[in-house]
Regions:
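Extracellular and organelle-lumenal recognition/adhesion modules and their flexible linkers in secreted
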Residues: 168, 177-179, 193-197
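A short coil-to-beta-strand element that immediately follows conserved catalytic motifs
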Residues: 79-90, 125-126
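Catalytic core of non-heme Fe(II) oxygenases with the double-stranded beta-helix
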Residues: 93-161, 191-198
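Short beta-strand His + acidic residue motifs that chelate non-heme Fe in jelly-roll/DSBH
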Residues: 101-104, 168-174
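Non-heme Fe(II)/2-oxoglutarate
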Residues: 1-82, 100, 203-208
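Karyopherin-beta/Importin-beta family HEAT-repeat alpha-solenoid scaffold
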Residues: 4-7, 169-171, 184
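A short hydrophobic beta-strand segment most commonly corresponding to one strand
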Residues: 112-114, 176-191
Length: 209
């Protein structure tokens, strides 16, 4: 009997792109002005609406486009002109050598993203959700089917979009500094069944100002 085919189903999707340009001097100067206005953890800015500042309007547009690309490529809505991903919160992270970010998720958010402002060589690690399995098998080699942690290499200008309930972390930083801009988002518009025999089921209109 031939060996059975392994078929991955219900994959978790992340997208990664590069904004394709350097950060302008005035953008960098403005973002660096927040490095001394961080929370007690010494990393996250107190301002959690950083992308609402007019000085970062172009950067916000790039982040918004990446969210819309994810929405259309992954969710593929039947009503693309009546639904979008709306950025709800955004903040800067200033990290130094030997610091790290614990494993965490983002609550009250559908998709979140990280734009790397200053990260010559960095990594974001995604962790598989706990399936409730109560056993451990040492694998001969790691594959997409048995990996528990997936590191993704990133650098300055990279923009990563992923589901907000996906556990992620940042390993110990080996460079002098790491600056990133993180943001949350939520559906804005109409969701649920829009057309067909199920029309109206779970229909919801969301209006985020």
């Amino acid at each position: 009997m031939k060996q059975g085919q392994v078929i991955p189903i219900f994959p978790t999707t992340i997208t990664i792109t590069n904004i394709g340009r350097d950060f302008e001097q005035d953008e960098m100067s403005y973002m660096m002005s927040f490095k001394d206005h961080v929370r007690d953890n010494g990393s996250n800015t107190k301002d959690i609406y950083i992308l609402e500042q007019p000085e970062l309007a172009d950067i916000k547009a790039l982040c918004h486009k990446a969210l819309q690309d994810y929405l259309r490529q992954v969710y593929n809505p039947i009503n693309p002109d009546h639904i979008e991903m709306k950025i709800t919160h955004s903040w800067l992270n200033f990290s130094r050598r030997e610091q790290f970010h614990y494993k965490h998720t983002h609550h009250n958010s559908i998709l979140c993203g990280v734009l790397y402002i200053d990260a010559a060589k960095d990594t974001i690690v995604f962790t598989k959700a706990d399936s409730g399995d109560n056993w451990q098998i040492q694998s001969k080699e790691e594959t997409p089917f048995n990996m528990h942690d997936v590191p993704i290499s990133v650098s300055t200008g990279d923009l990563v979009i992923f589901p907000s309930n996906l556990t992620h972390s940042v390993p110990t930083i080996k460079t002098e500094r790491r600056i990133s801009l993180a943001f949350n988002s939520f559906f804005n518009g109409t969701i649920g069944f829009i057309e067909g025999p199920m029309k109206g089921i779970n229909y919801l209109k969301i209006n985020i100002p």
